[in-house]
């Protein structure tokens, strides 16, 4: 799914509004995903998945950092996320459907924190962006 110039602008503007909250929003999205889709917990058997756990916060920060990197490389997501793609495909072997579940949780989290900025156009652009990130992260499964 190709991001248009308007999509790229929307993604960059929305992520800019996230600012210093990226790690917190990443952790919140993970917690939301674990609660809404309990099967996703199977990839984190060694984590304390309770509300506010340091491990969820730490992984949320990693998710946020990867997304921040992706936002900075919208024209080369495969290059920017190559190592992360290798990790998820070859070492962690995460079921690709889980990226869609996390994407949904991220959208809900962003909508709840940025209600005035989360217009239908921004929603659509972020959805396309997360879909592209998911596609890149699963590209090496083949």
UniProtKB/Swiss-Prot annotation:
InterPro entries: Globin, Globin-like_sf, Globin/Proto, Hemoglobin_a-typ, Hemoglobin_oxygen_transport, Hemoglobin_pi
UniProt GO molecular function: haptoglobin binding; heme binding; iron ion binding; organic acid binding; oxygen binding; oxygen carrier activity; peroxidase activity
Positions that bind O2: 59
GO biological process, one term: hydrogen peroxide catabolic process
Classification via Gene3D superfamilies: Globins
Chain positions recorded as heme b binding sites: 88
Cellular component terms per the entry's GO annotation: blood microparticle; haptoglobin-hemoglobin complex; hemoglobin complex
Start and end residues of each Globin domain: 2-142
Keyword tags: Heme, Iron, Metal-binding, Oxygen transport, Transport
Tissue: Red blood cells.
CDD domains: Hb-alpha-like
Entry similarity comment: Belongs to the globin family.
Subunit structure: Heterotetramer of two alpha chains and two beta chains.
PANTHER family: HEMOGLOBIN FAMILY MEMBER, HEMOGLOBIN SUBUNIT ALPHA
UniProt function note: Involved in oxygen transport from the lung to the various peripheral tissues.
Protein name: Hemoglobin subunit alpha-3
């Amino acid at each position: 799914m190709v991001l248009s110039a308007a999509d790229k602008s929307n993604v960059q503007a929305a992520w800019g509004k996230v600012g210093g909250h990226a790690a917190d929003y990443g952790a919140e999205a993970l917690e939301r995903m674990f609660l809404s889709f309990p099967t996703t917990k199977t990839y984190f058997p060694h984590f304390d998945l309770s509300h506010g756990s340091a491990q969820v916060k730490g992984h949320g920060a990693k998710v946020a950092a990867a997304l921040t990197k992706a936002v900075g490389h919208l024209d080369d997501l495969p290059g920017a996320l190559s190592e992360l793609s290798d990790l998820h495909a070859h070492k962690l072997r995460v079921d690709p459907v889980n990226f869609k579940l996390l994407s949904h949780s991220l959208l809900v989290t962003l909508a709840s924190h940025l209600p005035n900025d989360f217009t239908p156009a921004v929603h659509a652009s972020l959805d396309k962006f997360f879909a592209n990130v998911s596609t890149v992260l699963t590209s090496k499964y083949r």
